[in-house]
Amino acid sequence: MVGCDLLWLAAASCVLTLVSPSTIHQGYGRPRNSSNLDLDCGSPDSPSSGICFDPCQNHTVLNDPTRSTENNDSSVAWCDDNLHGWYRFVGDGGVKMPETCVSVFRCHTSAPMWLSGSHPILGDGIVSHTACANWNENCCFWRSEVQVKACSEELGEYHVYKLQGTPECSLRYCTDPSTAPKNCEITCRPEEECVFQNNNWSCVCRQDLHVSDSQSLQPLLDCGDNEIKVKLDKCLLGGMGFKEEIIAYLNDRNCNGTMQDEPNNWVSMTSPVVANYCGNILEKNGTHAIYRNTLSLATDFIIRDFRVNVNFQCAYPLDMSVSLETALQPIVSSLTVDVDGAGEFNVKMALFQDQSYTNPYEGAEVLLPVESILYVGVLLNRGDTSRFKLLLTNCYATPSEDRHDPVKYFIIKNRCPNQRDSTINVRENGVSSESRFSVQMFMFAGNYDLVFLHCEVYLCDSTTEQCQPSCSTNRLRSSRPAIDYNRVLDLGPITKRSAQSSATSKGTPHTTGFLLAWPMFFLPVFLALLF
């Protein structure tokens, strides 16, 4: 129980006690006939009626962050029915009582109490106010008289409160966390302020922020493989007049939505990495593919007078994957491979124009002179590429689109290149998520217009298997491989262009013609069947 007993009639020292955490400040009284409104004097009928004291020097300190209005822990409802006397609130929960109604079940109690009125300033002396308790949808369901005085010290001003318990339980006097001292342990941006809420310091958007220059709204970009995430500063948007719900549109107005909240006071919207989708503009140079778009912001879905337009772009280094994604009509084959215990993987095979593997052939077919080098790239573009490596076990050409065609010219056989064909160059196989090789056209095209490529793929578990091939002479002479045709990718047709093209057969040639019409082709095929 808090109280103030008369210790001496002449010169009394009033000592206040309270369960920790608290600090006791002591002061000396003055005769009751003092006319100074800064002093608190005992009741006329009490033993201390002749004693007056300054509550700025004689009060109990309450350092309890659970009194913060941000505290919504209602597991235990505490009550202040035992608080009688002068008190000063300190600490991270706030140093002043709130001056507006507080929601129920805040401040670690059921019915939180707040100050109905403005705090006095220095020179006002002791001011009487009503403390209200919110309950039953009534911000002032219970009332209690509170006296308040503004005080000063070297570090600034503060307030003390004379409390008289509470009308009922569980009622508790709250503190406003926005008045807490700025002993912030984190660094906030200039458009933020540091506040103590939910028992932690955090950065929140400044309420007094006013922004007129939209150029200050610089986006943060997350250039992902499948989408671009555009993040904007939520505080700056608030300073421009935007509310919690911000509607964003891309160049294609059908691509719109509410910007999503991100950590640290940012909001975001995503744009797919697809050419011409949602108004994306794709540009390519020799090294990068660049996607451009504009994010237009509005306050709702009806108003079309966009207040802010934010241009953004993401540049992707050209590689096999990006070049295929940005090509309009690449010649590509796709296969889904299921691996027990590891899920589904997607594998793609495409034809490229040069050894950079960034310029895929586009259109319905490829037309090449017989002396051309054909560049073939295969990539694993979905799945755990850190664990599984892409391995080409068998790659071969056929005179028809039938992958089962018995006439096969092997480029890669049993994981190793055909060493009898000096034009074959396997640049990568079994070491990453990509495999690539090249071969000269005339070595397998024969004297016919159309040929087809087929590659059997295997996803090698690098944690349990040796994935990079070891190609010895004995291995090269091994028997004809058993091909799993369910894991074969097909490409074609590849059309051969030559001076005698008018005399060659058109369409898909039959097997006999593929072998015999061009004598130069017979020997490589015969040797390929043997090795």
Curated annotation (Swiss-Prot):
Region listing for ZP-C, in residue ranges: 340-478
Location of region: Flexible ZP-N/ZP-C linker: 316-339
One GO BP: establishment of localization in cell
Disruption phenotype: Knockout mice lacking Gp2 fail to induce antigen-specific helper-T-cells and antibody immune responses after oral immunization with FimH positive bacteria. This is not due to a general defect in the immunological functions, since a normal response is induced by other systemic immunizations.
Residue span of region Internal hydrophobic patch (IHP): 340-351
Residue numbers spanned by region External hydrophobic patch (EHP): 485-493
Region of interest (D10C), residue spans: 54-74
Region entry Beta hairpin, spans: 34-53
InterPro entries hit by this protein: ZP-C (IPR055355), ZP-C_dom (IPR042235), ZP-N (IPR055356), ZP_chr (IPR048290), ZP_dom (IPR001507)
Membrane topology value: Lipid-anchor; GPI-anchor
Location(s), subcellular: Zymogen granule membrane; Secreted; Cell membrane; Apical cell membrane
GO-annotated molecular function: antigen binding
Assembly notes: Interacts with SYCN. Interacts with bacterial adhesin fimH.
Protein name: Pancreatic secretory granule membrane major glycoprotein GP2
